[in-house]
Amino acid sequence: LQINSSLFGETGQSSKLAAEFAASLAATTGARLVVRDLAHNPVPHLTAERFTAFATPVAERNLDQQRHVAESDALIEELRAADTVVLGLPMYNFGVPSTLKAYFDHLARAGVTFRYTAEGPVGLLGGKRAYVLATRGGRYAGTATDMQTAFVRQFLGFIGLRDVEFIYAEGLALGPE
């Protein structure tokens, strides 16, 4: 599963890198490549209505809640079906694109992608490898201003993806100085 989160869709730097990486991986392994472009097919941002729908027991959901949950379920099933995840991740104002945050909000579902235990939450989507192609205009990896890496690693681990490799392309907007 290749996930593009650039505002510029497939023409964004992170999307281009992710596409090249995913195509190479698919050619090497013979895997089928599925692409989710969050710019062209954005996931709705989380609302109180959607959040409530996710928490409502199945038998008690009204039609709107069923529709909201079905959208989330489709995203989760797409991820569950993937053996490998390739995420194109541009940095905007030191963080992740809001479209990616919205996507993550639809993936984080108690009892579906994680469960609570006495020892804390346990992710339910394990057994996958994730590659994160992170593009930045400046140089941020390993500094206090790199809030992306910790956030994305934490979220992916939360839902069970613990085998995560970050590949950085930095300094893409630096001038000659």
Q: Residue locations for each model-derived region?
A:
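Hydrophobic/aromatic beta-strand patches that form the interior of the parallel beta-sheet core
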Residues: 1, 34-36, 131-133, 165-167
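N-terminal beta1-alpha1-beta2 submodule of the flavodoxin-like/Rossmannoid cofactor-binding fold
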Residues: 1-89, 94-105, 109
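Cofactor-binding loop segments of dinucleotide-utilizing enzymes, especially the Rossmann-like FAD-
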Residues: 5, 135, 169
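Short histidine/acidic/glycine/proline-rich micro-motifs that form metal-
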Residues: 7-9, 137-140, 173
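Glycine-rich phosphate/pyrophosphate-binding loop and the adjoining helix
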Residues: 23, 142-177
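A generic structural signal for alpha->beta connector loops
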Residues: 30-32, 127, 161-163
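Gly/Ser/Thr-rich active-site loops/lids in small-molecule metabolic enzymes
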Residues: 107-113, 155
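Short, glycine-/small-residue-rich phosphate/pyrophosphate-handling segment
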Residues: 116-159
